[in-house]
UniProtKB/Swiss-Prot annotation:
The chain crosses the membrane at residues 41-61, 104-124, 139-159, 185-205, 215-235, 249-269. InterPro entries: UPF0761_bac, Virul_fac_BrkB. GO terms for cellular component: plasma membrane. Belongs to the UPF0761 family. Keywords: Cell inner membrane, Cell membrane, Membrane, Transmembrane, Transmembrane helix. It is a multi-pass membrane protein. This is UPF0761 membrane protein VV1_0885. It is found in: Cell inner membrane.
Amino acid sequence: MNQLFGSDKLRLPQRAQAGIAFVRYLIARMNHDRINVNAGYLAYITLLSIVPMLTVLLSILSKFSVFENVGSVLQSFIINNFVPASGDAVHAALQEFIANTGKMTAVGAAFLFVAALMLISNIDKNLNYIWRVKKKRRAVFSFSMYWMVLTLGPILVGASIAATSYITSLRLLDSEAISTVYDQLLRWLPFILSSSAFVGLYLLVPNKKVQFSHAVVGAMIAAVLFELSKKGFAAYITQFPSYQLIYGALAAIPILFVWVYLCWLIVLIGAEVTAALGEREHWRPAEDVIQSLPNNDTELEKDTQRDRFDSES
């Protein structure tokens, strides 16, 4: 560790050295995994699957009378808290798309369900690649897990929203002190929900054991980046409305794509942090970082060995 910078003269505390080695390894790991390319791919799949996902979710909620009106509340909450700027235009477009799906045949409805499964499957594959998972889940187990997400997920979301609405209607909130606490809780609710979702994602999706503390650290970093990017992206859209000037009424489409891309980039950064924290043995000096990456790509290994041979000869 004392030779982290290639010199014994420059000595840093052990924790600082470990931190610098971790950051270098993390950057090399993210470059190696090309998370910017994968984020673009996931953004593309998400835009193809977002309407099917919402359609499946809302159709399941509509089967339960207790969840009446929960769908509209859920859409408004997602748009207002997780889509910065142009939220009204995106909301209106999504509502129009979802309304049109009611005219579809059974074959079209089956296609929507397959598209929703495709998104979940691609998320699973990309995150398992980050953790270098070589052993794939059985097809039956994977399908049952995806099915559970699509069926139980909407029910749990609807139950939480219904419970929140019930608590809001109680007279206990008439108290000024409790009302202040409730307002603060609502202000922090998007951050709490996003960080909790990241923790669950980093713990449950990889087909290997992930330490809870590592998942929490990665989730907190991702949640902070998400909140900062939300404010920064909203400020950029409002202060520099180039998309509105160029695309006019269609500006919501590229804006939504860029935002979804940023979201997936943040998700993958948090996953890389979580995975790298569990690979302490690979935190080495910068010149050894690439060779230390646990890789499941045989072609890349061959290219690396060929480069070493050429340099030695």
